[in-house]
């Protein structure tokens, strides 16, 4: 089970076998602190910044999201480069997330054209005033990212206009991991969900294995029979990285439209991300 669920599913490994691995694409992650030496992603961390994680250096969340996006054996885009900014989300203060995003934008400014950071994966909701304080600081930073052409994807959606793409958790079928039509929205413990809005996109979260490291040099893996939407955001960012490798001219809005228009229909009638159809459509329609 541990090994089988390293597979991202939905045909991603067939794309990787064709050389579509996110190579040359720069992405960012804002999440909890991370020990950067895990073999899954040690050579993928381009830069690391700590906004003030109270002296903590390790977490459960950090290595999980990094491995799901760009892990060597787990990730959707194992050759993407990660700019990682750690922020203490448990303090429920979005000023740290805003600081993290501004750091990403500073890194982005220093990068040459053709090597810009394309997407920021945020497995949290720093724009939610019901959960966090100082959301105005986050919203201002997200607006700056939008102006810079950097797509910010959180559990609430896409950047300053989250309803452009509304993420939901999906369950992979253990017996048909590569078939998006065998997926459904929700969690393994649920019977199913109703059909959501047209811009909803369900992302694999359950039946996944992630990297783990709580003590420097003690590398491990954990299997999750049930994962939350936190696992889906880096998955989606990874699929986007595959798309940008195939066609670097895509804007953030364009890549979201393609993800939505190529989605498969799951067993409950909801839209499930379909990486293979997404890439095939880009190659056909854009000559990529």
Where on the chain are the PLM-derived regions?
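Extracytoplasmic/secreted envelope proteins and their assembly/folding machinery
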Residues: 9-13, 62-70, 97-102, 135-142, ...
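Sec-exported extracytoplasmic/periplasmic mature domains
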Residues: 20, 70-74, 78, 102-110, ...
């Amino acid at each position: 089970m541990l090994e089988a669920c390293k597979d991202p599913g939905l045909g991603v490994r067939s794309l990787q076998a064709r050389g579509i691995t996110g190579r040359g694409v720069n992405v960012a992650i804002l999440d909890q602190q991370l020990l950067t030496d895990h073999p899954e992603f040690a050579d993928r961390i381009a830069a690391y910044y700590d906004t003030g994680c109270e002296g903590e250096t390790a977490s459960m969340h950090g290595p999980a999201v990094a491995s799901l996006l760009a892990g060597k054996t787990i990730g959707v885009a194992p050759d993407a480069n990660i700019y990682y900014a750690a922020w203490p989300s448990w303090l429920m203060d979005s000023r740290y997330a805003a600081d993290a995003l501004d750091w990403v934008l500073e890194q982005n400014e220093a990068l040459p054209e053709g090597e810009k950071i394309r997407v920021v994966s945020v497995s949290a909701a720093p724009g939610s005033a019901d959960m966090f304080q100082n959301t105005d600081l986050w919203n201002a930073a997200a607006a700056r990212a939008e102006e810079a052409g950097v797509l910010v994807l959180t559990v609430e959606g896409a950047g300053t206009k989250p309803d452009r793409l509304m993420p939901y958790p999906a369950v992979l079928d253990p017996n048909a991991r590569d078939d998006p039509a065998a997926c459904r929205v929700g969690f393994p413990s649920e019977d199913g969900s109703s059909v959501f809005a047209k811009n909803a996109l369900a992302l694999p979260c359950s039946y996944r294995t992630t990297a783990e490291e709580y003590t420097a040099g003690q590398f491990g893996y954990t299997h999750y029979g049930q994962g939350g939407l936190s696992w889906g955001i880096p998955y989606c960012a990874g699929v986007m990285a595959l798309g940008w490798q195939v066609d670097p001219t895509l804007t953030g809005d364009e890549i979201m439209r393609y993800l939505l228009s190529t989605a498969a229909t799951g067993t409950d009638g909801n839209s499930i991300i379909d990486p293979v159809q997404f890439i095939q459509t880009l190659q056909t329609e854009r000559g990529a």
